């Protein structure tokens, strides 16, 4: 697997940050701005969230349409080997970014590694499903409104890059040192959009389906090309 610490956003450096890290820092700032704008809309212009109503996506333009396009493009870039400014951890499933090791493969050690990382990955999966079900239950029982449930997706959108750039709690389970070797690196969208499963409507379900597709492609590549 191709590894270059200069290209890994989560790798701290005592020298000046790499180009890709600078880009990720700017993206984090951008996502924080998105969170603040969405929070402002929640109180000042709640009608902007009508795009979440069933087929409301097609009724009138809104600020959330811009966010939908950004999210959709981001997921498409995960599905194609584009030369975009994204971490190697997100592209390592493509042949173009693969460098085979020179030593003979220890198949037993490889199998043990695959099993251990997969077990760790699905511990994370179970925890996230539990969190998603908890949020969904709060929504279904009317404790939190739909717009607030959507805001959790935006919060997760910010937390995604906090995990990459600052600190990731999932490393405690995954036991990996950096995002480049992370088994669940491209789980970001399926985790981010999981609250939208309960929202329904074209806006939410189009993102959920696309996120599920990106996740399935990632998982298939890991199984076929470990």
What are these regions (language model features)?
Residues 140-147, 199-208:
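Transmembrane helix interruption/hinge and helix-loop junction motifs
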